[in-house]
C-alpha cells in the first residue's frame, strides 16, 4: 500500500465534519482506499456476549459505542458532498472504505465467558482481575506495563524488572492501583499472558452516563 494522506480533515466552511484516518492506494489493484483505524482495549463484565458490557479501562468508552460510531459516522465520511469536492481538488477517487478495529479483549479471570457478538474468533485475548482476587494470580513473574507497551507482545524481558506474584500482591495490598494496571506474565524473558488488575470499585462500574 502507498500512503496518500493521513489525518485529512473534511470541512464544510469553517466547520470540521470529520477526519479521514488514512487514504491509501493499493499497489496491486490501483484502488484508492479510505481506512478508518482504531486500536482499543476493553474489559468484559456481566453478560460478555453483549458489546455494551465491554468497557475501556478508564470506563469512558464501550465497545458498542465505538463500533456504532465507526459504522454510522466514520465509515460514511467519503459519501459526503464535501468529500466529493475535496477528492476532486486532490485528484483522487475513493473506491472503498475499510473499518479496521484492532486491540485486545480482556475476559474475567477464571470465569468461562462468551466473546461479544461479531468479534473475530481469533482476536487477541487477556484477563482482568479485581484487587481482592489477586491471590488467584498464577505464581510467576509479572511486569506492570506502561501505556506505550500495551500494543505489542514483549520479548527479551530482563527478569530483574519483574515482580513475582507475592511482590505484586504486596505492592497493592493496602491502597490498590489508582487506575487499572496492565500486566504481562513473563516466562524465560517472553510474554505468555496479559491482563489488567483493577481496584475493587471498578468491578461494579456505573455505565449509565456512557451513551
Language-model segments: which ranges?
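Intrinsically disordered, low-complexity Ser/Thr/Pro/Gly-rich regulatory segments
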Residues: 1-211
Amino acid at each position: 500500500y502507498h500512503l496518500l494522506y493521513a489525518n485529512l480533515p473534511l470541512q464544510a466552511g469553517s466547520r470540521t465534519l470529520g477526519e479521514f484516518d488514512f487514504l491509501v492506494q493499493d499497489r496491486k489493484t490501483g484502488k484508492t482506499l479510505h481506512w478508518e483505524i482504531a486500536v482499543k482495549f476493553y474489559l468484559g463484565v456481566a453478560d460478555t456476549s453483549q458489546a455494551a458490557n465491554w468497557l475501556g479501562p478508564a470506563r469512558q468508552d464501550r465497545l458498542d459505542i465505538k463500533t456504532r460510531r465507526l459504522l454510522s459516522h466514520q465509515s460514511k465520511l467519503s459519501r459526503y458532498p464535501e468529500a466529493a469536492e475535496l477528492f476532486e481538488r486532490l485528484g483522487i477517487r475513493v473506491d472503498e472504505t475499510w473499518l479496521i478495529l484492532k486491540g485486545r479483549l480482556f475476559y474475567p479471570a477464571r470465569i468461562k465467558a462468551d466473546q461479544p457478538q461479531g468479534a473475530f474468533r481469533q482476536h487477541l485475548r487477556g484477563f482482568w482481575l479485581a484487587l481482592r482476587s489477586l491471590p488467584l494470580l498464577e505464581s510467576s513473574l509479572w511486569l506492570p506495563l506502561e501505556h506505550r507497551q500495551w500494543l505489542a507482545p514483549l520479548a527479551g524481558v530482563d527478569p530483574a524488572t519483574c515482580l513475582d506474584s507475592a511482590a505484586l500482591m504486596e505492592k497493592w495490598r493496602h491502597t490498590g492501583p489508582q487506575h487499572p494496571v496492565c500486566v504481562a506474565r513473563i516466562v524465560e524473558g517472553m510474554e505468555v499472558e496479559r491482563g489488567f488488575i483493577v481496584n475493587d470499585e471498578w468491578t461494579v462500574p456505573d455505565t449509565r452516563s456512557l451513551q
